């Protein structure tokens, strides 16, 4: 704890003892999902929201029982809106899209939102708003209003806020606000940006990788060791984003080596952490199908710029960058069909709460059994509804404080 009683902020590994984390408890934004929009909003099914909330509460309880401070994004957003007029202006500006709803309706909507209490505004910014819910009659001045159905969204919901890993992550003492690849998630970064800019808890926090538009998502970034970062490039993070992030962390002295790891561009492996996560300081759990083929380009900070080498096998490149003899892979020993099923259900997407202790979905029975057989303690949580958006415990968490290794 520091003098204010808060946990000092900063993260330099995947497995250092977890002290504080940001989660987002599923809310009304999930109730906006319908068979008509779930694909567009990146959910494979319509979750049972009450059960998803129960599962998420269990996740938060498991973390708290291990001494982790759990901060909820909706609370942080409400608190920031309460203390800062600038936060309100920022949130409203990001939510009111004149390109979609036109100038006339945009003015009406912004004027209404400026009068809303912080808690209600927080809910609108995350859960969205339909035309029927807009308590003003702009029909006489807005063609957009007249031509839309009442159930259409004047502000789109953000159901993927559940996955707090993607819109921000920490490298050392700095926070990085990302640029998300798909339009359904683009506004999530404005929520996290607002919280970090205006919530008192984050006063004085410095940022890295600012003012970049090339896509980078936190699920593609693994802090393999202090100074060593892996960045997946695939469906979400682009080569341009990975290079910009690498150069940024080099310039800020946050890393000496970055491994850029190409991954297959498909939904099942949308992020690097869907196929590989760290469970100990020298060990990973990895989807067996890619173990022998995953490669990496090695970028290093040099006196005269940045050197690029490779591609070479990922496990070799990682061990070399980390200064260890070998990066161990927990042998799940799964047959092809079981491995594919459990990878789809985020069996490799674990969250380490300390070295050798991870949170995982209980449904991935075989992967969890192999982890335990290798000496890893597995804290099981339910995920039948949470998994509808294709994300596991690591996806659903943004660590903001870990102990150094």
From Swiss-Prot:
EC number, as in UniProt: 3.5.3.6
Superkingdom of this protein's organism: Bacteria
Pfam families linked to this entry: ADI (PF02274)
Keyword Hydrolase: yes
UniProt keyword terms in alphabetical order: Arginine metabolism, Cytoplasm, Hydrolase
GO terms for cellular component: cytoplasm
Biological process per Gene Ontology, one example term: arginine catabolic process to ornithine
MF-aspect GO terms: arginine deiminase activity
Entry-linked InterPro entries: Arg_deiminase
Active site (UniProt): 395
Intracellular or extracellular location(s): Cytoplasm
Reaction catalysed by this enzyme: L-arginine + H2O = L-citrulline + NH4(+)
This protein's pathway: Amino-acid degradation; L-arginine degradation via ADI pathway; carbamoyl phosphate from L-arginine: step 1/2
UniProt family annotation: Belongs to the arginine deiminase family.
PANTHER family: ARGININE DEIMINASE (PTHR47271:SF2)
Protein name: Arginine deiminase
